[in-house]
């Protein structure tokens, strides 16, 4: 009776697992389209799963966890194996990179019926056997083991489990442990590489989905790119290896960069720097053009390697002399062009006559060809003066027609009202479209500030070019070259002295020489008649330059005569 109930319960679990698988695949496909975290590392991944009786009612959660995590490792160079343990260990799927076989292995894993004791060391033995045989075949691929259990191990079982885990590590494997619910964290920390390699799940099997991202991040060791990817043949260089998980090794000092040259020779180099996302490694010298080096990384001092699809190729490189010669020729051509442009400015001097200023065009001209002037209009202005001596009074009225240019020279009366002529401004009319609508202003573009600055720079360069081009002699101009000669002055400079006492020979002053006096004649006798007055000499002294001090200037006009 108990056997029949157990079979019925197993069939029910199978149907429930099948329905769950359909839902999981549908949901997983949608999540993969959205894009999520994935691992591109090329290594061997072993799942060691506890199928003892304590997980009988939680096997679906374990399967769901493994199925989701397996789909995160998408490298074509990654191989996977499924191992279960209870009283003994069983390999459900041997190591393979075939995705179809991995899908079939997941189906076999779903059909597992838990039961028995927790002999974890049996699962590690099955993994170590595969690692050993793979290494003997020469693959030497890095291995990652993820072991899951839910209970505490007995003292003797813990001893065997730790021993087998150390054996797997000696073969080059990295061991991670997942503990669910009633596990002993101290035991798992000794079985795994370190305490950081343990993922506790204290909230039960339902919380396994929450650690998938953490396991993927810590267990994934991948090589994504190499810089540079193309090198010069026969030259030494350094390569930067980009990737993830390079510090997940137990000992960072055991990390190596490996170069597999033409799939035949493997050369290992110690990196200069080891970070979680990159390695700085010296690369070997590849002497021939066309050689290829596949990039690998070892986390255990060359015991096993993490492969990748990153390849470094060699090419022929020149020594740079051709480029240097080309740059030198371009520089010489540029120097000759500048010399041809600026040599006339430095040597030839052209003197040109200044052109007369252009005559300003006036809108209105009078009869003489002179532009008419607008004079102010003045009312009630009286000015005196007409006729000889200004005797007759003259009345001048500036009316609406304005005055003449001569009238502007007269003095303005006190009661005059001046009206200045108004200046008329013509504003440009806005341009209208055919439908009598004004053209809308164009919207401001995002590149308008940049375009404005470039236009201003272009205007500045254009002005400088125009200034230089105007100074250059035109064809047909003649001139002469400037010769600069330094003349040495032997006489030292003297300070000018303005004091007359210090001058040795003052300039001669003009001396006025009066004319000779007239000859003295004796007085005539009293009875003699009076002789005529002699005429003045023909030569007279020059008149004085300034007028006499007591003489007043003549009036500007004669005073008015009184009316009779």
From Swiss-Prot:
Entries under SMART domains matching the protein: VWA
Glycosylation sites: 166, 184, 262
TM segment ranges: 322-342
Disulfide bonds: 39-220
Domain VWFA as annotated: residue spans: 44-215
Gene3D superfamilies found in the cross-reference section: von Willebrand factor, type A domain
GO MF assignments: actin filament binding; collagen binding; metal ion binding; transmembrane signaling receptor activity
Membrane topology according to the record: Single-pass type I membrane protein
UniProt record, GO biological process: actin cytoskeleton organization; blood vessel development; negative regulation of extracellular matrix assembly; substrate adhesion-dependent cell spreading
Phosphoserine sites (modified residues): 362
Region forming the signal peptide: 1-32
PANTHER family in alphabetical order: ANTHRAX TOXIN RECEPTOR, ANTHRAX TOXIN RECEPTOR 1
Function of the molecule: Plays a role in cell attachment and migration. Interacts with extracellular matrix proteins and with the actin cytoskeleton and thereby plays an important role in normal extracellular matrix (ECM) homeostasis. Mediates adhesion of cells to type 1 collagen and gelatin, reorganization of the actin cytoskeleton and promotes cell spreading. Plays a role in the angiogenic response of cultured umbilical vein endothelial cells. May also act as a receptor for PLAU. Upon ligand binding, stimulates the phosphorylation of EGFR and ERK1/2. (Microbial infection) Acts as a receptor for protective antigen (PA) of B.anthracis.
Subunit structure: Interacts with gelatin and type 1 collagen. Interacts with the actin cytoskeleton. (Microbial infection) Interacts (via VWFA domain) with the protective antigen (PA) of B.anthracis. Binding does not occur in the presence of calcium.
Protein name: Anthrax toxin receptor 1
């Amino acid at each position: 009776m108990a056997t029949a109930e157990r079979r019925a319960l197993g069939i029910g679990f199978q149907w429930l697992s099948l329905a769950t698988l359909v839902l999981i695949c549908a949901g997983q496909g949608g999540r993969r389209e959205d894009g999520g975290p994935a691992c591109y590392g090329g290594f061997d991944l072993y799942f060691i799963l506890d199928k003892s009786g304590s997980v009988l009612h939680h096997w679906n959660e374990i399967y769901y966890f493994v199925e989701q995590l397996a789909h995160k490792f998408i490298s074509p160079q990654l191989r996977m194996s499924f191992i279960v343990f209870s009283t003994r260990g069983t390999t459900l799927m041997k190591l393979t990179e075939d995705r179809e076989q991995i899908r079939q292995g997941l189906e076999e894993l779903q059909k597992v019926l838990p039961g028995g004791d927790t002999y974890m060391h049996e699962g590690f033995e099955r993994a170590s056997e595969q690692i050993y045989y793979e290494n003997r075949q020469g693959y030497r691929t890095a291995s990652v083991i993820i072991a899951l259990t839910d209970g505490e191990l007995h003292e003797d079982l813990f001893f065997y489990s730790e021993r087998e885990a150390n054996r797997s590590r000696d073969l080059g494997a990295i061991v991670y442990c997942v503990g669910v619910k009633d596990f002993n964290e101290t035991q798992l920390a000794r079985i795994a590489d370190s305490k950081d390699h343990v993922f506790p799940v204290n909230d039960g099997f339902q919380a396994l989905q929450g650690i998938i991202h953490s396991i993927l991040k810590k267990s994934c060791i991948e090589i994504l790119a190499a810089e540079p990817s193309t090198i010069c043949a026969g030259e030494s260089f350094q390569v930067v290896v980009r990737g993830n998980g390079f510090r997940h090794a137990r000992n960072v000092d055991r990390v190596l960069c490996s170069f597999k040259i033409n799939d035949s020779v493997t050369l290992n180099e110690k990196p200069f720097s080891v970070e979680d996302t990159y390695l700085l490694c010296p690369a070997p010298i590849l002497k021939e053009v066309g050689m290829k080096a596949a990039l690998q990384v070892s986390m255990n001092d060359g015991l096993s390697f993490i492969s990748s699809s990153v390849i470094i190729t060699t090419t022929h490189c020149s020594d740079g002399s051709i480029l240097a010669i080309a740059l030198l020729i371009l520089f010489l051509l540029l120097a000759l062009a500048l010399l041809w442009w600026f040599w006339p400015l430095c040597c030839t001097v052209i003197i040109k006559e200044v052109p007369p200023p252009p005559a300003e065009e006036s809108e209105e001209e009078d009869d003489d060809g002179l532009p008419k002037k607008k004079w102010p209009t003045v009312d009630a202005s009286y000015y005196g003066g007409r006729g000889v001596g200004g005797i007759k009074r003259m009345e001048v009225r500036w009316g609406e027609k304005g005055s003449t240019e001569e009238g502007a020279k007269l003095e303005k009366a006190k009661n005059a009202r001046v009206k200045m002529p108004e200046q008329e401004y013509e504003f440009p009319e806005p341009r209208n479209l055919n439908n009598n609508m004004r053209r809308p202003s164009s919207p401001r573009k995002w590149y308008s500030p940049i375009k404005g600055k470039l236009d201003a720079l272009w205007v500045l360069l254009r002005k400088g070019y125009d200034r230089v081009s105007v100074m250059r002699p035109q064809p047909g101009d003649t001139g002469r070259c400037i010769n600069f000669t330094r003349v040495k002055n032997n006489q030292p400079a003297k300070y000018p002295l303005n004091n007359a006492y210090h001058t040795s020979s003052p300039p001669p002053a003009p001396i006025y020489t009066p004319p000779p006096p007239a000859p003295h004649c004796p007085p005539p006798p009293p009875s003699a008649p009076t002789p005529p007055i002699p005429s003045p000499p023909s030569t007279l002294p020059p008149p004085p330059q300034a007028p006499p001090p007591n003489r007043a200037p003549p009036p500007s006009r004669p005073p008015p005569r009184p009316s009779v």
